[in-house]
């Protein structure tokens, strides 16, 4: 998208948010996620929250894991730093705040390895944000003032079906879930995750919720495809309802 198109689309984020919500019926508003490099202007306020006491290894953060910011970002816009994300070392790694070597020294990463929940090869193969950010900004897509890098939605099984129909090449991932943000940003790909036990415990996501991500630069394209898919699905539902009358 050209700079001229970006300027002309600045006021379209509320409309795109509404269209996404109508098509996918998410459980919360779409969240815009923007990665800010050192030296870039950050207009979003810092999220003010105290840090709990660090554990015996010195690990703490503003929230139990960075995925918790997804929950807050549905209703407020704020900027976060590496320290804010630091209680979850896997999330800090996938978001570019830690290198693989740094993450491997953290006690929570050792804990997941020792438990057998995930192995080193799986972590080494995770997609990650390649450039360390100065900050990550979260907020409702409807309130965005510029194109976000990624838009994240919490959706149902119905929403996942609709998105997969609209974007057949969409990736469907498992744990640790946060890596789908890196997939969208670095690979320009639409992706979804069935979730992760750690993330569900920390965020309070309901069992029926899933997460999906759309690259900011593909929002218009994907939204249009979703709307076309919804129309087709409605016609099939109507057909099935008429056909089912024979069984009444």
Locate predicted features.
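Acidic, serine/proline-rich low-complexity intrinsically disordered regions
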Residues: 3-248
């Amino acid at each position: 998208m050209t700079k001229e198109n970006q300027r002309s689309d600045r006021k379209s984020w509320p409309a795109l948010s509404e269209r996404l919500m109508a098509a996918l019926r998410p459980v919360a508003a779409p969240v815009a996620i923007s990665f800010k490099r050192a030296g870039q202007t950050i207009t979003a306020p810092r999220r003010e929250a105290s840090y709990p006491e660090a554990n015996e290894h010195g690990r703490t953060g503003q929230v139990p894991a960075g995925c918790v910011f997804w929950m807050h970002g549905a209703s407020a816009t704020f900027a976060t730093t590496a320290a804010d994300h630091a209680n979850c070392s896997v999330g800090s790694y996938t978001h570019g705040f830690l290198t693989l070597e740094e993450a491997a020294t953290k006690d929570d990463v050792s804990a997941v390895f020792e438990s057998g929940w995930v192995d080193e090869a799986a972590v080494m193969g995770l997609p990650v944000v390649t450039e360390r950010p100065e900050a990550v900004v979260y907020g409702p897509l409807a309130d965005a003032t510029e194109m976000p890098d990624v838009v994240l939605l919490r959706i149902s099984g119905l929403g996942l079906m609709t998105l997969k129909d609209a974007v057949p090449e969409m990736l469907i991932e498992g744990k640790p879930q946060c890596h789908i943000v890196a997939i969208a940003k670095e690979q320009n790909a639409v992706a979804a995750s069935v979730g992760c036990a750690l993330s569900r415990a920390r965020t309070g996501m309901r069992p029926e919720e899933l997460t999906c991500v759309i690259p900011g630069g593909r929002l218009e394209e994907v939204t249009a495809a979703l709307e076309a898919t919804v129309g087709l699905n409605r016609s099939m539902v109507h057909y099935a309802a008429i056909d089912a009358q024979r069984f009444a």
